[in-house]
């Protein structure tokens, strides 16, 4: 019974709360949907986690203060999202999404994806990088600190690790572990793979809806194609598909599989479309979320936004779009400057 309660808490904090909170930033979007609500909620949760974690690191606050702060912010956002959904009277199903008979191809894709979720969770790969990432989370939980103890030695840091401290994704793992009452290794190897692989396919489905807006069968075939490609991605240990299946609980893998594709999708809908599909706030949150996941995310998210900025200028000659895109790059640029200063 105790394990059932912990699993329900994991579902609450990793699915229900972000899903409800996503309605806050999507309340005015014409492209809102159940899947986008969850993705937007994660952008919000990761952004708050990044900001609060960095503040806690520099202020040397204990982990429980950070945990209660993030829980309060996300719970408030979830309540607000539910209220906004009730006011709009369309629940969380989105604006004008068609519901009808499910495509046979989509059912096949769903079965393939479900098998991947089971395989990733119950046949978990043990990775050497866990010696730092999972150990940092475990150390933080058991010492009630935030990036204060070196997981390799057990001694306090004399100098913060510049490579990791600005992207404290292990601290997010520690927060979730503390909130749900499960060991960080269990959360990383059993819970996170299910959630993040599911999110990766949600992002791919957003592309399918963009490319095949009126053809449900084509969307299903596209998802089958993606699932099969990912199943047979082990020809290299360096591609994003392999990262997705083998070590999705690590920030760099989650970045490559979920959040960079999501950032590109949002950038296309906001910067490269004449009629803006989502708010600029969502793009800003996406940049901050990439910063949380990995130090590479700080660089790659900024590079992607700059490329989209140039493409937007060429297409629309809009200084307003360029200025807004530049503002969305600010978190990456600021963290890049901080990295140069502390290394």
Predicted regions located by residue number:
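Membrane-embedded, hydrophobic transmembrane alpha-helices
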Residues: 1-96, 315, 333-340
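Active-site lumenal/periplasmic loops and adjacent helix-entry segments of GT-C-fold
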Residues: 115-230, 239-249, 254, 258
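Perimembrane helix-loop-helix junctions
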Residues: 301-326
């Amino acid at each position: 019974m105790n394990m059932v309660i912990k699993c329900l808490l994991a579902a609450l904090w990793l699915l229900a709360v972000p899903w409800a909170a996503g309605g806050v930033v999507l309340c005015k979007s014409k492209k809102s949907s159940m899947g986008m609500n969850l993705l937007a909620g994660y952008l919000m949760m990761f952004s708050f986690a990044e900001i609060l974690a960095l503040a806690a690191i520099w202020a040397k606050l204990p982990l429980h203060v950070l945990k209660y702060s993030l829980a309060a912010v996300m719970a408030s956002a979830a309540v607000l999202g539910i209220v906004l959904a009730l006011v709009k009277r369309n629940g969380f199903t989105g604006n004008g999404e068609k519901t009808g008979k499910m495509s046979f191809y989509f059912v096949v894709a769903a079965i393939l994806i479900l098998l991947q979720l089971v395989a990733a969770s119950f046949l978990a790969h043990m990775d050497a990088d866990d010696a730092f990432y999972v150990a940092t989370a475990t150390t933080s939980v058991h010492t009630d600190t935030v990036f204060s103890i070196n997981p390799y030695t057990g001694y306090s840091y004399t100098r913060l690790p510049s490579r990791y401290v600005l992207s404290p994704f292990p601290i997010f793992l520690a927060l979730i572990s503390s909130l749900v009452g499960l060991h960080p290794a269990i959360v990383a190897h059993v819970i996170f793979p299910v959630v993040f692989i599911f999110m990766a396919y949600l992002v791919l489905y957003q592309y399918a809806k963009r490319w095949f807006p009126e053809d449900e069968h084509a969307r299903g075939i596209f998802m089958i194609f993606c699932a099969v490609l990912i199943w047979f991605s082990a020809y290299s240990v360096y591609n994003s598909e392999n990262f997705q299946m083998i070590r999705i609980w690590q920030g760099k893998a989650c970045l490559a599989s979920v959040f960079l594709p999501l950032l590109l999708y949002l950038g296309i809908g906001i910067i490269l479309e004449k009629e803006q599909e989502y708010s600029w706030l969502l793009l800003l949150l996406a940049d901050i979320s990439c910063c949380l996941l990995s130090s590479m995310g700080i660089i790659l998210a900024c590079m992607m936004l700059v490329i989209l900025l140039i493409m937007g200028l060429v297409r629309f000659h809009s200084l307003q779009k360029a200025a807004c895109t530049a503002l969305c790059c600010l978190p990456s640029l600021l963290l890049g400057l901080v990295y140069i200063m502390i290394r």
